[in-house]
A protein has these predicted regions:
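SDR active-site strand-loop-helix element
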Residues: 9, 34, 59-65, 102-108, ...
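Adenosine-cofactor binding site in Rossmann-like domains, unifying the SAM/SAH pocket
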Residues: 24-49
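NAD(P)H-binding glycine-rich loop region in Rossmannoid oxidoreductase-like domains
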Residues: 45-84, 96
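Catalytic tyrosine of NAD(P)H-dependent dehydrogenase/reductases that use a Tyr as the general acid/base
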Residues: 127, 136, 209
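Conserved beta-loop-beta element that borders a ligand/cofactor-binding pocket
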Residues: 101, 106-107, 144-172, 182-184, ...
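Active-site helix of classical SDR
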Residues: 135, 139-142
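C-terminal substrate-binding subdomain of Rossmann-fold SDR/epimerase-dehydratase oxidoreductases
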Residues: 3, 9-10, 14, 18-22, ...
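Conserved Rossmann-fold NAD(P)-dependent oxidoreductase catalytic core, especially the SDR/UDP-sugar
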Residues: 88-133, 159
Length: 314
């Protein structure tokens, strides 16, 4: 039996590394990866040459330039250009070299700032985007539309998934530009080590957010990639578009902070600074389609936070 040759682009990132971990447990596939030094995804000729020589059967497109609000505001040209180039180069090369299937990993920032909650797939392009990361979001929307367009024009089977807020091993724990879960894990860890009497969390604690462990994201990605084409098309008509991936359950930032305090073993007070901005009151993805396709998340928030904290400690 010939093994399927699967290229995971972005294998050193949080999602890409989780997909590689799960694929490598199987005996029927050969996982192909390249570091940035080995293959510059911004170089279209290099990408073409790679696909010409490697005979790839499937692609997981998890490579992206990512960053926090400050980075997105400081380098908007880099975010839109590099992400659009990575997507265009890989999707076009995959098409030219007859890659059967491709899965593009997007981001829930593609949806309008004031989207109806929970956010269904049909909310795409129904309103104005969040200004702070608009260039990144536009690039991710372009990736969805590239997949759609190659499906429509060339009868390709290129699919897209839109994850909610992700966390887990290999997340960015940088002190100044990490997302809420790694930022709070680090802050409570340091407060515990220093016996700090309280930890201040920005905002009122009332905004609702949804969080998905990266191992669940990887499992969902593989599940969606492996669906029969007819089943996929029935669930993404009329535009052969994208599917949301999340838990369908959200929690307040207050509940999140208190859970993290318990996981870390912090015994002091958790204080909310309501003078600081809260951001969007609620952001929850509608995952009805994903559930209809037979996939549900398995890692609870408590389990996921505990294992992520263990990874951080190691």
């Amino acid at each position: 039996m010939t093994k399927q040759r699967i290229f995971v682009a972005g294998h050193r990132g949080m999602v890409g590394s989780a997909i590689v971990r799960q694929l490598e447990q199987r005996g029927d596939v050969e996982v192909i990866v390249r570091t940035r030094d080995e293959l510059n995804l911004l170089d279209s000729k290099a990408v073409q040459d790679f696909f010409a020589s490697e005979r790839i059967d499937q692609v997981y497109l998890a490579a992206a330039k990512v960053g926090g609000i400050v980075a997105n505001n400081t380098y908007p040209a880099d975010f839109i250009y590099e992400n659009m180039m990575i997507e265009s180069n890989i999707i076009h090369a995959a098409h030219l070299h007859n890659v059967n299937k491709l899965l593009f990993l997007g981001s829930s920032c593609i949806y309008p700032k004031m989207a109806k909650q929970p956010i269904a797939e049909s909310e795409l392009l129904q309103g104005t985007l969040e200004a702070t990361n608009e260039p990144y979001a536009i690039a991710k929307i372009a990736g969805i539309k590239l997949c759609e367009s190659y499906n429509r024009q060339y009868n390709r089977d290129y699919r897209s998934v839109m994850p909610t807020n992700l966390y887990g091993p290999h997340d960015n724990f940088h002190p100044s530009n990490s997302h809420v879960i790694p930022a709070l894990l680090r802050r409570f860890h340091e407060a515990t080590a220093e016996n700090a009497p309280d930890v201040v969390v920005w905002g009122s604690g009332t905004p609702m957010r949804e969080f998905l462990h990266v191992d669940d994201m990887a499992a969902a990605s593989i599940h969606v990639m492996e669906l029969d084409r007819e089943v996929w098309q029935e669930n993404t008509e009329p535009m052969l578009s994208h599917i949301n991936v999340g838990t369908g359950v959200d929690c307040t930032i207050r509940e999140l902070a208190q859970t993290i305090a318990q996981v870390v073993g912090y015994k002091g007070r958790v204080v909310f600074d309501a003078t600081k901005p809260d951001g969007t009151p609620r952001k929850l993805l509608d995952v009805t389609r994903l559930h209809q396709l037979g996939w549900y998340h398995e890692v609870s928030l408590e389990q996921g936070l505990a294992s992520t904290y263990q990874w951080f400690l190691e």
